[in-house]
Structures are given as structure tokens and as C-alpha cells.
């Protein structure tokens, strides 16, 4: 497969989810996307990484079915669902799942969140993604950009 990668991270609690700003990490050791893969040399989080239509497709084909599957299987999942995707000419392809906030993606996504993130996490841990505790500029992801270098 060929294409750029993107990370779509969602907070999940008892069948509910909220998608955060899409992010992309940069894994290669050297400039020009050369060298060995690392744990991440930096990341960018931006609304402009993918279109709203593509995010809707990822939600419809990956995030929502995953959360519905957890609910169907009676798995009381509360945490982050991290979908690592490759954007191919045939559409987004799931490369990996993680049940954590990606790093270094978190370092680029978290500064975009407004509000009481600690209270949001506590609420999610109790099974409720409370609207109003955090804000993404009144959309499900921010129009702002953030770059993180390690």
C-alpha cells in the first residue's frame, strides 16, 4: 500500500465516542522521510490533514463499527481508540489499532483542546463523555493547527 498516514483518535465510553483532531506523526530518523522508523520524531494535528468527507468515511467505516462491535460483544471499553490509517487511492485502510492516545500525536492534539480535560477524562472513566467539558471550536475537531517536534 502507498499513501500518507493519518491517525484518528476517539475517546470512547460505554458505546459513545468523540473523535479528536486528526494527526500525523513523522517516524523516519532522517530528513526527507529517510532512515529507520522511530517511535516518532514529531507530529502535526490539523483539520486540513483530511477533508470532512474523508473523516465522515473513516467514522462510518472504522470508528463507529468498532465502537458498536465493542458494545455488541458486551465489552465495557472506556479509553482511547487510536486508528492508524493509510490514505490510499482506494480509500482509507486501517493499519493498526491501539487502545491509547498515540505519542507523539498526543503532544500535537492536546494543545488544541479547550476546557477541563481532566474532568472530561474522569467523566469518561465513569462511562459518560460529558458534552461541554471540552471544546473543539464547536466542531468535532479543531480548525487550528499544532506542530510538535521531539
Predicted regions, residues:
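Active-site "cap" helix and flanking loop/linker of ATP-utilizing ligase/carboxylase catalytic domains
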Residues: 59-81, 99-150
Amino acid at each position: 500500500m502507498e499513501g500518507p498516514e493519518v491517525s484518528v483518535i476517539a475517546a470512547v465510553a460505554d458505546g459513545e465516542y468523540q473523535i479528536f483532531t486528526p494527526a500525523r506523526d513523522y517516524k523516519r530518523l532522517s530528513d526527507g522521510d529517510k532512515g529507520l522508523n522511530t517511535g516518532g520524531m514529531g507530529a502535526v494535528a490539523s483539520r486540513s490533514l483530511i477533508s470532512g468527507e474523508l473523516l465522515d468515511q473513516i467514522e462510518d467505516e472504522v470508528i463507529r463499527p468498532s465502537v458498536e462491535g465493542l458494545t455488541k460483544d458486551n465489552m465495557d471499553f472506556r479509553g482511547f481508540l487510536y486508528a492508524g490509517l493509510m490514505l490510499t487511492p482506494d480509500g482509507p485502510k486501517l493499519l493498526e489499532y491501539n487502545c491509547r492516545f498515540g505519542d507523539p500525536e498526543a503532544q500535537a492534539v492536546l494543545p488544541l483542546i479547550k476546557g477541563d480535560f481532566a474532568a472530561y477524562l474522569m467523566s469518561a472513566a465513569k462511562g459518560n463523555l460529558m458534552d461541554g467539558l471540552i471544546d473543539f471550536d464547536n466542531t468535532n475537531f479543531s480548525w487550528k493547527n499544532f506542530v510538535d517536534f521531539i
